[in-house]
A protein has these predicted regions:
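Catalytic-core "active-site belt" of small-molecule-metabolizing enzymes
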Residues: 3-177
Length: 177
């Protein structure tokens, strides 16, 4: 039995859109962040059939939080099967975004174990622009698609000052961008 209040058919439709890189279908009005968080594990299972591969923070920009009426960032789930390796070659997907991130591995109690560079590929396209709400962002898992973790360093040995020296290279059609 589900512990959420959203229609199963809605989760099926969203999962299909995510898996096929299509626009998210029109969503019912008034989906709360709380309802979306309750439904999110059920969506992840529909998308991948496997367990989450980790957590992701989203809407970390305070201006966007204010626009969406939030006081803190949102959390989503990374798909375990979506972990990719350096040098990944992907087909073009209209609207896909590339986000440079920091990956942090946590132990079971949530304490940081290691940290390193990460790249997240995000694909989120609402068919109805007005559907861009905090609850709907959570419900659609904030566009989680693929992610790449770089070399991880033990948390207590990481020099956070080196972050200004990180270089990322994107190659598109054989050209460095």
């Amino acid at each position: 039995m589900s512990n959420h209040r959203l229609p199963e058919s809605l989760l099926d439709d969203i999962a299909l859109a995510i898996k096929t890189h299509r626009s998210i279908p029109p969503l019912p009005k008034g989906i709360s962040v709380e309802d979306a968080y309750a439904a999110l594990p059920h969506l992840v299972k529909r998308v991948t059939g496997d367990r989450p591969g980790g957590l992701k923070a989203g809407v970390t920009n305070t201006d966007i939080q204010a626009f969406l009426g939030l006081e803190e960032a949102l959390l989503g789930m990374l798909y375990e099967s979506s972990a990719a390796s350096d040098g990944l070659v992907l087909p073009f997907v209209k609207g896909r975004k590339i986000e440079c991130e920091m990956g942090i591995r946590l132990n079971a109690d949530g304490s940081p174990l290691s940290v390193g560079p990460a790249v997240e590929l995000v694909n989120l396209d609402f068919s109805v622009p007005e559907d861009l709400t905090a609850g709907n962002l959570v419900l659609c898992n904030m566009g989680t698609d693929r992610f790449i973790l770089g070399n991880m360093t033990p948390w207590d040995q990481f020099d956070f000052g080196l972050l200004t020296e990180v270089e990322i290279t994107v190659i598109h059609d054989g050209k460095t961008r």
